[in-house]
């Protein structure tokens, strides 16, 4: 029987699962940048991101982080808990890069005195604008208690991921997290991949992420394969 699609985003499709508490997430090869202004396809990106995200979520589970991920079903699909997505993106910045470097006039690659957490309102029509906690609560996107829990989880995930990737000679420059509500709890959702993270080789500072697509640097698929190979060797 053909699965019923519940939602299609830029990089993934969400389908009904056999029970109401789960969904099947399908990873596409579509690539977008600049809020959809730039579009293309990257060969095997969906397969690579599914494998990378599955491996990272499994590692986070071992470290006590609860996520929506249940198991990898095949090359492109995961079984995940059906969460109510909190319409926020949490951006963690360990090193100045990307839009923050441009916005604040900071040179890319500058080490920061402290890690920066930013939140954006998930709204494609508005271009996912940067907001603060008071906006989020005033607009009914989250409560202060939920934000506190989101930041606690984010801090723990950042510490785990920085250590994990550095062991693979990868610097975690910045990354985006999304969260969902499930059975009254806030849990980590979405994906963790070169689509949502900036990964630099710790020795050469070579970019191993979607910046290669954004900036027309070439070898995009090869960079994603390199990330998968390094984290696979970590197991």
From Swiss-Prot:
Keyword Cell inner membrane recorded: no
GO molecular function: ATP binding; phosphoribosylaminoimidazolesuccinocarboxamide synthase activity
Keyword Nucleotide-binding found: yes
GO biological process: 'de novo' IMP biosynthetic process; cobalamin biosynthetic process
EC number: 6.3.2.6
SUPFAM superfamilies according to UniProt: SAICAR synthase-like
Catalytic activity: 5-amino-1-(5-phospho-D-ribosyl)imidazole-4-carboxylate + L-aspartate + ATP = (2S)-2-[5-amino-1-(5-phospho-beta-D-ribosyl)imidazole-4-carboxamido]succinate + ADP + phosphate + 2 H(+)
Alphabetically ordered keywords of this record: ATP-binding, Ligase, Nucleotide-binding, Purine biosynthesis
Database matches in NCBIfam families: purC
Family: Belongs to the SAICAR synthetase family.
Protein's name in the database: Phosphoribosylaminoimidazole-succinocarboxamide synthase
Listed Gene3D superfamilies: ATP-grasp fold, B domain, Phosphorylase Kinase, domain 1
Enzyme class: ligase
Pathway involvement of the protein, from the record: Purine metabolism; IMP biosynthesis via de novo pathway; 5-amino-1-(5-phospho-D-ribosyl)imidazole-4-carboxamide from 5-amino-1-(5-phospho-D-ribosyl)imidazole-4-carboxylate: step 1/2
Species annotation: Clostridium novyi (strain NT)
